[in-house]
């Protein structure tokens, strides 16, 4: 055996080097995939407390690092078109005697949601943390109001049909230059006398590819321009 190894030493040495190279390549791949998994942002959008339209819309950060929630966008797809609203900030309509009730509601929301500050969901979200942005019913009513749709209970009036509600979050992750995002679509189902809401997909869609992040940049610019225009109109009125 030793004579055979001595005679074929060069070939054995080459095979040994190739085997060692393969082991190191596999080891490097494992390290790379482990590093990428730890660095990959992971955000979830789910229903909480209930399973119908009264459920809370919960955003969870399952990433290894904190994320900064910059925008929360909701899109209501209807038979009369799509309504898109930036719901990052809460809006309240005041009537006589509403000040105390809204203050109590604000305090309650602040206790149950870790980010709400001065009526805004914008801010950092720690790893393993979560925040609820509102109930799906409240989001639907807010978008219906902005779209000019009349509501009776959970149902739209005047022949309007609600098809789906999509929630999209735009965040800054760690030291990344471009934003990352996540979105999930929920479909309305007729469940008399109320209204049901079920996820259209089993998981939250991650928006982290290069072209998706560039699209999020353009959306941020559009949202900021819209905010500037609203501020200008308010100051002139």
Language-model segment annotations:
Residues 53, 67-70, 129, 161-165:
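Residues at beta-strand starts and edge strands
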Residues 46-48, 88, 136, 170, ...:
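A structural detector for beta-sheet-dominated domains
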Residues 2-34:
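Membrane-embedded hydrophobic alpha-helical segments
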Residues 49-56, 133:
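Contiguous beta-strand segments within globular domains
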């Amino acid at each position: 055996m030793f004579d055979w190894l001595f005679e074929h030493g060069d070939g054995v040495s080459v095979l040994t080097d190739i085997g060692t190279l393969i082991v190191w390549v596999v080891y490097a791949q494992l390290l790379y995939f482990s590093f990428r998994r730890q660095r990959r942002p992971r955000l979830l959008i789910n229903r909480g407390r209930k399973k119908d339209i009264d459920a809370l819309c919960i955003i969870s950060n399952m990433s290894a690092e904190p994320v900064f929630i910059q925008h929360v966008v909701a899109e209501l797809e209807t038979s009369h078109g799509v309504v898109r609203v930036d719901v990052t900030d809460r809006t309240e309509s005041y009537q006589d005697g509403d000040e105390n009730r809204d203050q109590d509601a604000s305090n309650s929301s602040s206790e149950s949601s870790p980010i709400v500050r001065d009526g805004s969901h914008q801010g950092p979200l720690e790893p393993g943390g979560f925040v609820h942005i509102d109930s799906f019913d409240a989001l639907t009513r807010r978008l219906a109001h902005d779209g000019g749709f009349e509501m009776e209970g959970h149902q739209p009036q005047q022949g309007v049909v609600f098809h789906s509600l999509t929630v999209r979050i735009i965040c800054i992750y760690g030291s990344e230059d471009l934003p990352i995002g996540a979105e999930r679509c929920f479909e309305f189902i007729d469940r008399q006398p109320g209204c049901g809401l079920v996820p259209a997909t089993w998981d939250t869609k991650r928006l982290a590819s290069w072209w998706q992040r560039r699209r999020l940049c353009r959306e941020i610019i559009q949202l900021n321009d819209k905010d500037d225009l609203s501020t200008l109109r308010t100051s002139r009125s």
